[in-house]
Amino acid sequence: MKLEIERKFIVKSLPKVKPDDIYEIEQFYFKNDKGIWERARTYHSEKSGNMYIHTIKKTVSKGVNMEDEHELTKEQFDNFKNKCFQKGIEARHISKERWVYKDGNLKWEVDKFKSGYHLIVAEIEIPNKRYDIKFPKFMEDIILLEVTGIKQFSNRSLSIKIDNIL
């Protein structure tokens, strides 16, 4: 498990500079038999190819999570995805484009949602909770509102319930 400290902002547009990478992301969530939400995510970019990641997050405090993450094979990802469509499973789905911008030792991840929302959210993972973010020029003019720790803006909350009643 690793500690993840991040800040999240609603932005009015994508930055007007060229990103370092762009990913197509699809995420599936389901609540396991212990009542814990699990996530499987697939990333695809021309630079990095395909990646499949399984994650369980536990909220520690506002903007701070413990994260248990490991890589999946495509077959394991497909099995997870298929489980989300089984009868009686509480499951959710979201898809988005992620635009990645390096900023010194940090990186901004700007997500443009495809799943029915006209919403763009920027996140930055920081080394500690007291870290003073210096907004780079490309982010200064587009940030509208900080939403760190507001549950309604978590990816899982923004995801769409899978209708798996067969």
Where do the protein language model's features map onto the residues?
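Phosphate-end processing signature that detects enzymes handling 5′-triphosphorylated RNA
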Residues: 1-166
